[in-house]
Design a protein with these regions (language model features):
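A polyanion-binding, active-site-adjacent surface
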Residues: 1-178
């Protein structure tokens, strides 16, 4: 048998442009966010407090007692509130999401699930920072909005209520008007 002849033609060499991979794209500077929220639930009410970073144990205990008393006074129901602490970021790792958008998405989903499970009708945000993180809006104490059939009331922080009888009286006026 005879082997076939190889014919070599002059073909032009085509160069394809180099396309950078996705990981080489420039990323915008993302500011990391840290917070700790205490969520107290009793009946169909929820109280969300932004826990200050450097809070001593006695202050934290007084804040918890005040939150419990507020919820009991609103609903006049026996029993103790369910309390949950939500921290962000979820865990420490260089690749873990820490930005405001991820925090907001996680927190909204988490709180929405808690509201649905308990059929919540009233959410009290204790302090502006609690409202900023949990509600995603910057409201001042005394402001109230309604979303999806749930009343959202922003009030003073528990620390402010503990230290100021005038703020505490104003808070009870806000609750009475709800």
């Amino acid at each position: 048998k005879v082997a076939p002849k190889l014919v070599v033609e002059d073909t032009p060499v085509v160069q394809t442009p180099v396309v950078p991979v996705a990981s080489e794209k420039k990323t915008k500077d993302v500011k990391s966010v840290r917070f700790e929220l205490a969520v107290y639930m009793l009946g169909n009410a929820m109280l969300i407090e932004s826990v200050p970073e450097q809070t001593d144990l006695a202050h934290r205990e007084f804040s918890q007692k005040l939150a419990v008393n507020i919820l009991k006074a609103i609903h006049r129901q026996p029993g103790e509130p369910v309390t949950q602490l939500i921290t962000w970021p979820l865990f420490e790792h260089p690749n873990a999401p820490k930005d405001q958008e991820a925090a907001s998405s996680y927190l909204k989903g988490k709180l929405q699930g808690m509201k649905v499970d308990r059929d919540v009708e009233l959410v009290i945000y204790s302090g502006r920072s609690a409202a900023d993180f949990a509600l995603g809006e910057s409201l001042t104490p005394g402001e109230k909005i309604k979303r999806d059939g749930v009343d959202h009331l922003v009030t003073y922080s528990l620390g402010q209520l503990l230290n100021s009888p005038a703020m505490k009286a104003d808070f009870w006026d806000q609750i009475s008007a709800s």
